[in-house]
């Protein structure tokens, strides 16, 4: 019944060309309404879990201590940077940045109090603060004081004094695209300095920009490579035109639908357009190769289309199931990616079996008149290796399968954004400079909270001033000692750079107190007198909440550290906190973007394993239903399983971690492997002849595979490392899928006839 409907549909195209053409044009028109809404989402929100408990803690921390979104401007000069002229120019730059929309404040050397010109006692220091360009200061001495400062060293000046920094605190909105653009525009006008901009709030922005540039530049070159290679295969412009026009229609309609549905492209879904191009070209080649092969046998085009529809349908359905399973994830960008690919594959199927038949009615493609790539492979490899493969495939698999099961267990799950970029790029140099000289990039926050306490006021403690209060909460020596002890232990971790809290301010006060420890009275004085200025209060409120019961230790990770493992780092910090606060009333929470990124990675990894398991089982059931055979279902499932194993093993051997970008490669392996396996199995079981199968379905597989591999070789010239990895490992996956489908699948399928 279903086959008859399919046959009737293809037979009707000849008589209803205008009707079906109108459907395509209507689809293009409707989707065009959403083109302007299609966008890339560069917000940090795309890198967090929607229902993450740690995200709620992170938001609460932002409410209590202010937004933790910031950028860092690293400024260097070919000559001495700490001169009056340079400082005046940098103050001008600071003033311009402060008024940019999205910027809340800028912390720089101009906000750092100089307290040792002259150096006075602790009590007199409250009125002894001076500031660069506001007071007369000895600049070399001021520079050295900042370098030695427990607060400002590696915050606004490097330890060697050659690099100054602006910490640009942002206002907490969702998107900083225009803010980053405006800051970079201001930076370009200060050509006497070497200025690098980096920081967590622009990592996603730059990543998305690299992806955009790669899509435009390498996408165009890849399409050109596809065109040339396909022409060399088909020796006719018309089938090549059909393939690329169909891909263009599919991508245009899909992008329009994404815009209408408000599904933006994020880092997680950045390979969407490339995957859509792959699937579109694959199905088009299978259709045209079938029509061209059958043309030699005087089989009608409508009959050829009817025959190829079923394997294409099941290929599309298995792919849709695979991507639809991502909807079960709790990560919004992953859910959106699943929706995008599911809709894209469906639109690809509909367009391919609507546009291609219409194009063939307009002008059919030429029949094969000479030997092709399948003939070459059959005569120069397949025949010679057939006997060996028949004997060796089982022993080979017995050795190979345990290997590809074991090696992926050594895969690391880590996301080091600095590794995304080429060493010559601005963002890499900025992140490297900040990591080496200015205390690291990605922030971690440790929130420490004290319980309510009844404060007893001693009149003798009020001698400092009328408004003075006794030391309370974190300003008590007992609690401050605990804070300093924990911070000192955390600071010793190699993966962390700058670690900052109110304890750094107390260390500065101790220096002013002739390195004598501070008691409750001195701590109260520091709190109520030394930190009483408006500038000091603005800094203080980012480290202690208004109740003064909760305080924050702020740390930044050295993202360029070769030993960085965020998950292990968080566990190590947790152990330090447990050891110090076990049995006390002090509560602690570890939060910050570093924690949220890690949670996303761990969730991606676990959901990927679940998804792959679900997909492989689904493929097994669907293919078993299609072929009415459990053995065929197992055989087809076997191909993507090995392909995924090979790619993951390669990544393990090359020490390439699974991260936000590379984790989607497994989905590509499954998608392409299933495509090849179903088409080859369908034809092989029907023909029961290896040569005929290779020269028909095998030809389509070889054309598709080598075309995509050739196109992806272009990605090797990208400055964006995930694009390179995507091209390389997609190529490896496709190559192994071809080999396994053509050489191994017939051997496994032969088992059912024995």
Model-identified regions with their sequence ranges:
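Pore- and gate-forming transmembrane helices of large, multi-pass membrane proteins
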Residues: 244, 283, 296-329, 688-719, ...
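Hydrophobic transmembrane alpha-helices and their membrane-interface caps
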Residues: 239-287, 631-681, 713-714, 740-743
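Transmembrane helices with small-residue packing motifs
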Residues: 21-53, 75, 331-333, 398-431, ...
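Juxtamembrane segments of multi-pass membrane proteins
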Residues: 384-522
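Interfacial helix-loop-helix hairpins and adjacent transmembrane helices
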Residues: 1-25, 350-405, 409, 415, ...
